[in-house]
Regions:
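Basic, helix-initiating cap at the start of DNA-binding domains
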Residues: 1-43, 50-57
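Amphipathic alpha-helical segments used for helix-helix packing
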Residues: 99-127, 168-173
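Short amphipathic alpha-helical segment with a characteristic S/N-K-E followed by hydrophobic residues
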Residues: 16, 54-59, 69, 121, ...
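Amphipathic alpha-helical linker/stalk segments
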Residues: 60-93, 139
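Hydrophobic/aromatic residues within well-ordered alpha-helical segments
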Residues: 12, 55, 66, 87-90, ...
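Hydrophobic/aromatic-rich alpha-helical bundle segments in the mid-to-C-terminal region
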Residues: 142-191
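Amphipathic alpha-helical segments that line or abut small-molecule/effector binding pockets
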Residues: 18, 84-99, 105-109, 153, ...
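Amphipathic alpha-helical packing segments from all-alpha helical-bundle domains
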Residues: 119-146, 188
Length: 196
């Protein structure tokens, strides 16, 4: 009985997050309506507020739901392969996620667009996406037996920053036709810079 009610609560939270994502993407953060989110989720407004205290809580939950640094940065997988292979696996996972996940791209666009008016939301994104990835990659770069870098934190930022830039140009700004760059060529060149 308890697991059934727990599953219903999980399903309801998922429905709310799905409704919130649709509303935020359609209207932006400022114009998003809690009434429309509740309607899209098929829940009452009091139920919506019992799960998430408000619009900011909903947005934060969406960011946390979409953050998957653990999947991209699997420590055991990273440390058991030669450094070139480890970085390549990570880069391919990251870029595939970046290019293949339309909700993530939409959320990224929204955060960039709203960051001037809502810096707290942008900081929530940095805290939940960038910070964990950079911290974990810095640690892994320092631990990898095949790599000796002077500053693992700087190296992690260069690596992740290069991939984010590639994703922004190719996917968010639709630059494939203007600045074409084969993904594998980009990844191999980036890794050579780091490991040499």
């Amino acid at each position: 009985m308890k697991s059934s009610s727990k599953q219903k609560a999980t399903d309801k939270a998922e429905a709310i997050l799905t409704g919130a994502m649709q509303e935020f993407m359609a209207c932006g953060y400022a114009a998003a309506s809690m009434d429309r989110i509740a309607m899209a989720a098929g829940v009452s407004k009091p139920t919506l507020y019992s799960y998430f205290q408000g619009k900011e809580g909903l947005f934060t939950a969406l960011i946390q739901q979409m953050s998957q640094s653990d999947r991209i940065l699997d420590e055991a997988r990273f440390l058991q392969h030669p450094i070139h292979d480890s970085l390549k696996l990570m880069a391919i996972d990251f870029l595939d996620k970046f290019s293949g996940d339309q909700p993530l791209l939409s959320l990224f666009r929204l955060i960039i667009g709203e960051s001037g008016r809502f810096p707290d939301l942008a900081q929530t994104f940095v805290r939940n996406f960038e910070q964990p990835v950079l911290e974990k990659l810095s640690y892994l770069l320092a631990q990898h037996p095949d790599l000796k870098v002077a500053d693992p934190e700087v190296t992690a930022r260069l690596f992740v920053g290069s991939m984010v830039h590639y994703g922004i140009i190719q996917e968010i700004l639709h630059g494939r036709a203007i600045l074409p760059m084969d993904r594998d060529r980009f990844v191999d060149g980036l890794i050579k810079l780091i490991v040499s």
